[in-house]
């Protein structure tokens, strides 16, 4: 994600956001991370509820998967920070998987896309 200033992020996630399984939802949208957060006793941890094999996980399954694999999207000091990050992540993933990938890449590169070609 381009700009996470002010979110108090403790640890960047360790999941490749651009190689996620794509799950078709009942409304026709695509889910790749479908995140949630929980407090692990130290930080608010944002985790996906879409498994690496493309299954939609219940909250308990997602938390169990985190403890089993150690994979997470981000760690934060507060629920509010985690929620703001999850919202930004959802919007970025939506643009990447459902929108114009060139526009998405251009935003990530800070508007330098046209200069590359």
Could you say what each language-model-derived stretch is?
Residues 1-7, 12, 104-117:
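Extended acidic low-complexity intrinsically disordered regions
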Residues 7, 33, 42, 71, ...:
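N-terminal functional modules and adjacent low-complexity/disordered segments of proteins
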Residues 41-74, 85-91:
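Short aromatic-glycine-(Arg/Gly/Cys) micro-motifs in beta-strand/loop hairpins
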Residues 11, 19, 67-68, 91, ...:
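Compositionally biased, intrinsically disordered low-complexity regions enriched in proline and serine
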Residues 1-58:
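Short N-terminal "domain-start" leader segments
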Residues 75-79:
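Conserved aromatic
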Residues 87-105:
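Short arginine-rich
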């Amino acid at each position: 994600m381009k700009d996470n200033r002010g979110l108090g992020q403790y640890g960047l996630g360790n999941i490749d956001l651009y190689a996620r399984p794509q799950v078709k939802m009942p409304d026709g949208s695509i889910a790749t991370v479908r995140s949630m957060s929980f407090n692990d006793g130290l930080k608010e941890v944002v985790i996906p509820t879409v498994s690496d094999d493309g299954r939609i996980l219940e909250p308990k399954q997602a938390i169990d998967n985190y403890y089993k694999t150690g994979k997470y999207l981000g760690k934060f000091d507060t629920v509010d920070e985690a929620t703001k990050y999850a919202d930004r992540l959802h919007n970025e993933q939506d643009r990447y998987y459902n929108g114009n990938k060139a526009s998405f890449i251009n935003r990530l590169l800070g508007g330098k896309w046209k200069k590359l070609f």
